[in-house]
């Protein structure tokens, strides 16, 4: 189709699934702070008045599994049962095991063999980049994130004091000949105090959240703003819906523009290629687009458990490449080492950097710790491509 609408959504840090993601990554960071080589797979479930932690953790770190979830929930803004959750009074249950020794066989390596550390599981991961925004992200998901980020900023600052933590956004963009033309529909659903009128809520969201974020030149003349379409959103957070780690994988990545291998990120240490290889694939794709070798680039990489070298590598530029996809795949092999330990080393992933990733997207953000967003290989790719 040469003329179509494409839609992406995001959710706020107060959405119950994102609460779970943030708790899982806060626990991961606390462990990595003490034990960078720990094996962590932390899953979180949160419901009314309850947080349940489970998974597999092998570490010598000593952390308080009761305090970290509460601190995370408190920072998000759930401090009263009236708004759906109370960090001070919620129950926290834990049920952790250690990593299976059968899995550890393929992952653990001596110092001399560490670059041959095997993948922690089989699987396929995708990375994507395009020239629709300066951050080389698809425009719909980029602005969907910025909208809920703005909602949280205004809520925490008190500028819109009637806002509550749970919120969702959705942005529909008109594409013509493969390029974004304008934004036609914006949906914002935000939790709110019960005494705010629909009129005041609509005006506050449109004037203070939407318009300051979206570029005016991208707004269509007949743009639709759908604000709390049901008319009321007082009950939210874990009281409104049960939250689970890893249930917002499209929000976390490219908003549906690119493929997804199915593996979630949060709560997983970087020996899990679900996370580290997806970051590396973004790094590869972004450098190709930053080099001007393609307007769009999707990279797939796949692994076998216990095996260091990827079992496959695929690249697609959707007809936008300056050179053939085969040539670009050759450049990837020459310039990027996609073995798990090499990824961890190149992107410096054994650090407590993951809590920031757990809301508002893992990609397209200008955070110094997001090393997979750097474009330091672009110049070398240009030179090797010979153009």
From Swiss-Prot:
Pathway: Amino-acid biosynthesis; S-adenosyl-L-methionine biosynthesis; S-adenosyl-L-methionine from L-methionine: step 1/1. The keyword Transferase applies. Its EC number is 2.5.1.6. L-methionine binds at residues 56, 99, 241, 272. Binds 2 divalent ions per subunit. Binds 1 potassium ion per subunit. It catalyses: L-methionine + ATP + H2O = S-adenosyl-L-methionine + phosphate + diphosphate. Keywords: ATP-binding, Cytoplasm, Magnesium, Metal-binding, Nucleotide-binding, One-carbon metabolism, Potassium, Transferase. It is an enzyme of class 2 (transferase). GO terms for molecular function: ATP binding; magnesium ion binding; methionine adenosyltransferase activity. Residues 99-109 are annotated as: Flexible loop. GO terms for biological process: one-carbon metabolic process; S-adenosylmethionine biosynthetic process. GO terms for cellular component: cytoplasm. K(+) binds at residue 43. InterPro entries: ADOMET_SYNTHASE_CS (IPR022631), S-AdoMet_synt_C (IPR022630), S-AdoMet_synt_central (IPR022629), S-AdoMet_synt_N (IPR022628), S-AdoMet_synthetase (IPR002133), S-AdoMet_synthetase_sfam (IPR022636). It is found in: Cytoplasm. It comes from the Bacteria. Pfam families: S-AdoMet_synt_C, S-AdoMet_synt_M, S-AdoMet_synt_N. ATP binds at residues 15, 166-168, 232-233, 241, 247-248, 264, 268. HAMAP family: S_AdoMet_synth1. Homotetramer; dimer of dimers. NCBIfam families: metK. Catalyzes the formation of S-adenosylmethionine (AdoMet) from methionine and ATP. The overall synthetic reaction is composed of two sequential steps, AdoMet formation and the subsequent tripolyphosphate hydrolysis which occurs prior to release of AdoMet from the enzyme. Belongs to the AdoMet synthase family. This is S-adenosylmethionine synthase. The gene is metK.
């Amino acid at each position: 189709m040469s003329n179509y609408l494409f839609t992406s959504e995001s959710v706020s840090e107060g959405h119950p699934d994102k609460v779970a993601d943030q708790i899982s990554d806060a626990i991961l960071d606390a462990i990595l702070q003490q034990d960078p080589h720990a094996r962590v797979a932390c899953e979180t479930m949160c419901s009314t008045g309850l947080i349940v932690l489970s998974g597999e953790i092998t570490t010598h770190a000593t952390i308080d599994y009761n305090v970290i979830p509460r601190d995370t929930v408190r920072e998000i803004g759930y401090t009263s049962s009236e708004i759906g959750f109370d960090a001070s009074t919620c129950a926290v249950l834990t049920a952790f095991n250690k990593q299976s020794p059968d899995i550890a066989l393929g992952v653990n390596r001596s110092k001399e063999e560490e670059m041959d550390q095997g993948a922690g599981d089989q699987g396929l991961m995708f990375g994507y980049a395009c020239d629709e925004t300066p951050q080389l992200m698809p425009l719909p998901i980029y602005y969907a994130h910025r909208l809920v980020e703005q909602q949280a900023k205004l809520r925490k600052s008190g500028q819109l004091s009637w806002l509550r933590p749970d919120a969702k956004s959705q942005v529909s963009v008109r594409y013509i000949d493969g390029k974004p033309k304008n934004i036609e529909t914006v949906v914002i659903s935000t939790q709110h105090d019960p005494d705010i009128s629909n009129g005041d809520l609509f005006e506050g969201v449109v004037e203070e959240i939407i318009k300051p974020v979206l570029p005016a030149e991208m707004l269509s003349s007949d743009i639709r703003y759908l604000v709390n379409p049901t008319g009321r959103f007082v009950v939210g957070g874990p009281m409104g819906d049960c939250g689970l780690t890893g249930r917002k994988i499209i929000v976390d990545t490219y908003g549906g523009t690119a493929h997804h291998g199915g593996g979630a990120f949060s709560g997983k240490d970087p020996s899990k290629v679900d996370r580290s290889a997806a970051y590396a694939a973004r790094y590869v794709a972004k450098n190709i687009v930053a080099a001007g070798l393609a307007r769009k680039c999707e990279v797939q990489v796949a692994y076998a458990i216990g095996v260091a070298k990827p079992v496959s590598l695929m690249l697609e530029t959707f007809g936008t490449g300056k050179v053939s996809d085969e040539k670009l795949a050759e450049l990837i092999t020459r310039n990027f080492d996609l073995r798990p330990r090499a990824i961890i080393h190149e992107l410096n992933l054994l650090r407590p950097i993951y809590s920031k990733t757990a809301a508002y997207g893992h990609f397209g953000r200008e955070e110094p710790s997001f090393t997979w967003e750097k474009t330091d290989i672009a110049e070398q790719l240009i030179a090797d491509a010979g153009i």
